[in-house]
Amino acid sequence: MASIDFRNKINWHRRYRSPQGVKTEHEILRIFESDRGRIINSPAIRRLQQKTQVFPLERNAAVRTRLTHSMEVQQVGRYIAKEILSRLKAQNLLEEYGLDALTGPFESIVEMACLMHDIGNPPFGHFGEAAINDWFRQRLYPEDAESQPLTHDRCVVSSLRLQEGEESLNDIRRKVRQDICYFEGNAQGIRLVHTLMRMNLTWAQVGGILKYTRPAWWRGPVPDSHRYLMKKPGYYLSEEKYIARLRKELQLAPYSRFPLTWIMEAADDISYCVADLEDAVEKRIFSVEQLYHHLYHAWGHHEKDSLFELVVGNAWEKSRANTLSRSTEEQFFMYLRVNTLNKLVPYAAQRFIDNLPQIFAGTFNQALLEDASGFSRLLELYKNVAVEHVFSHPDVEQLELQGYRVISGLLDIYQPLLSMSLNDFSELVEKERLKRFPIESRLFQKLSTRHRLAYVEVVSKLPMDSAEYPVLEYYYRCRLVQDYISGMTDLYAWDEYRRLMAVEQ
């Protein structure tokens, strides 16, 4: 196995206007400080404050948004990174692993990957994703792309429909249809950072948010060796060349992951499990006492010094022992959070170190907190109680259904842009308004300038005389609509839907 040298992974160069020459430790740290500034000051991060964590359209500021959740993940990620570096230092391994001059960048990459990990999520979270994918599948029918005879293809878009005698073009059509129908928040995050926001981050920093390594256009079985790493789409066809370059710069084998991404993932797992339960109590879905009993019964067999007693039981007893200075509710979650972090962070750090050869190679085919240990069982306990008692609550389900309808409705409203012919839409893009298309002109004007420019730039580079042009133009037109709607906040999407459906009070 190749030696572990993080100097080959923590690549401080950029796609554009990259720093040149040999850099000192301080100069490299400044490059990653620049990344931090670009990320923290980006509109994509600000929009997280009005995007759903669990409870859509929530007016109670004490309940988490995507932004407050991401800040908590950032803190836990920093904690895990510091724990890893501290343990490696104690074993005199920092220099051997090429980290002695890169501890600052190591921490910074993890922190900013944690802060960015949700930036591609659409309004209303997973229900927004489902709405986008269902809407496009009902029109593009990606499953029919393998149909025989080709006349069975139900795709409603003529340029994407399979044609006899056009096998090479049909392959592209299949790829495009699959890609469009697999919108995914992590893949959209890569698209935001590179294509839409043009943040020009270092290769290492972008590698930190490439959580899944399966391209969205993938068809067929996934290799067992990468089943976990490829369980969801990680990037789109539109970013294929960029990801190929990223892999080269970070020395990543096909479908392998950047090492520090495992830390971001563990931080997210630790953070949201406790946070979702705390938000449910804040929303009065259940009381702290009811939550404790849910956790107690879901754990199963109890022993005196079990992990449950050391973490959950200890938090419950301490919160009941002193109710003078703080409420039981507040104290319980303070102790639960502290106890959980004190157990899971060192464990995650040690798992990273113990599996470092595979993690460095990018092939470790599971999460750090996904094993047969009691620590993994504790996380599963939190998740299972949330699924059974929070996500299935009628109020939560009603809001999710409303969110699904809002996103589906917005796609219906913007559908005329996708129904235009290639020539008509090209003319609309050029002139911005066409008298013979009054509705389409007004819809086009509502699209953000950033998204329109991204469409124009990529389509202008396509060879117009090629047979692929109509297929790829329509692909990027679909991306244009998806970019715009997925970039909305929950509240903006809700308000926009009500305005355009003429139900505004």
Swiss-Prot record:
Cited CDD domains: HDc
Recorded catalytic activity of this chain's protein: dGTP + H2O = 2'-deoxyguanosine + triphosphate + H(+)
Entry annotated with the keyword Hydrolase: yes
Stored Pfam families: HD, HD_assoc
Stated name of the protein: Deoxyguanosinetriphosphate triphosphohydrolase
Subunit note: Homotetramer.
UniProt entry tagged with the keyword Hydrolase: yes
Stored InterPro entries: dGTP_triP_hydro_central_sf, dGTPase, dGTPase-like, dNTPase_1, HD/PDEase_dom, HD_domain, PHydrolase_assoc_dom
Ranges for domain HD: 66-273
Keywords, in A-Z order: Hydrolase, Magnesium
GO biological-process terms attached to the record: dGTP catabolic process
Any one GO molecular-function label of the UniProt entry: magnesium ion binding
Top enzyme category: hydrolase
Cofactor: Mg(2+)
Domain of life assignment: Bacteria
UniProt record similarity statement: Belongs to the dGTPase family. Type 1 subfamily.
EC number(s) on file: 3.1.5.1
Function recorded in the entry: dGTPase preferentially hydrolyzes dGTP over the other canonical NTPs.
Underlying gene: dgt
Gene3D superfamilies, sorted: Hypothetical protein af1432 (1.10.3210.10), putative deoxyguanosinetriphosphate triphosphohydrolase like domain (1.10.3410.10)
